[in-house]
Amino acid sequence: MSTEVNANQSPNAESRQEAARSGERDKALNLVLGQIERNFGKGSIMRLGDASRMRVETISTGALTLDLALGGGYPKGRVVEVYGPESSGKTTLTLHAIAEVQRRGGVAAFVDAEHALDPVYAASLGVDVENLLVSQPDTGEMALEIVDQLIRSAAVELVVVDSVAALTPRAEIEGEMGDHVIGSQARLMSQAMRKITGNIGKSGCTVIFLNQLRLKIGVTYGNPETTTGGNALKFYASVRLDIRRIQTLKRGTDEYGIRAKVKVAKNKVAPPFRIAEFDILFGKGISTIGCLLDLAEETNIVARKGAWYSYEGDNIGQGRDNTITWLEQNTEAKEKIEKLVRQKLTEGSEVSSNSMRPLTTANRKAA
């Protein structure tokens, strides 16, 4: 009889013991979390599922196709690297991001290590040049220290560094022409990344580094291209964009812009290896209406038969340029098409062409 009673009571006793252990564990966890926050400050440790940490806010790139490929735009509180050959649209891409930040009331800074920023061109892209913070540092150390202080202020939403290749170490500047200072720039970037990464996460500031391409000597097989400044930036960047000029836009013999293709080479906040294409017009920047037309065609909102584009059964233009002109002149139709495009993209409508496609083995060779 006593054996049956003990057997019946055993599960209850085990559950009480488990509850007691769980209570002690929770108490110990709360004590250590409180101790860590007292020692290192509030927010030094947190649960990943907190609502404030789950969703990564973004800054628009200025190109709807690229926003789609990135999962919304440049992520806030992260490091972004944009690299590519000369005259491919790197600076234009970042100036559009600056204009977007300023339009929303934020503060942006441009660290012009190349000493090549054109304020007239920046203003034509919508940048408020009077309120844009600009620094033209003498050395790489000075540039990165300015970047660090801007980040730690938590008052700046976006910092652009143009470019990593122009961040010349002090030892190289103070030395004589022809002196070999091996690895000095890579060491400088590695130290800077270690120092600023933590502050970027706390302040929510986005830092975009522009970078140039170099060729590895003696590479017979594989891609000989590499970026400057060592490997540190490759590891610390949450997003890496490879931008290339794939076509020159012409009207007759007059060149009026380029067609750019961006490969998302790395993305920690959305699926990587997507591709976006858009037009960059000389003196005007990214063609937002051109991006809209591309996506409207891919989502079957605007149809194309031969050279003619049609919307709701009516022809709106013969050829891409004429259709873009029609959309510029008919703002009501443009806004309606944009609303439909965003609605379809939000619903997960499949976009099948270059503006958003995984870079598979087959199309990687084609790209």
Swiss-Prot record:
InterPro entries: AAA+_ATPase, DNA_recomb/repair_RecA, DNA_recomb/repair_RecA_CS, P-loop_NTPase, RecA-like_C, RecA-like_N, RecA_ATP-bd, RecA_C_sf. One of its GO terms (biological process) is SOS response. SMART domains: AAA (SM00382). Keywords: ATP-binding, Cytoplasm, DNA damage, DNA recombination, DNA repair, DNA-binding, Nucleotide-binding, SOS response. Residues 1-14, 349-367 have a biased composition (Polar residues). The keyword Cytoplasm applies. Belongs to the RecA family. This is Protein RecA. It comes from Prochlorococcus marinus (strain MIT 9211). The gene is recA.
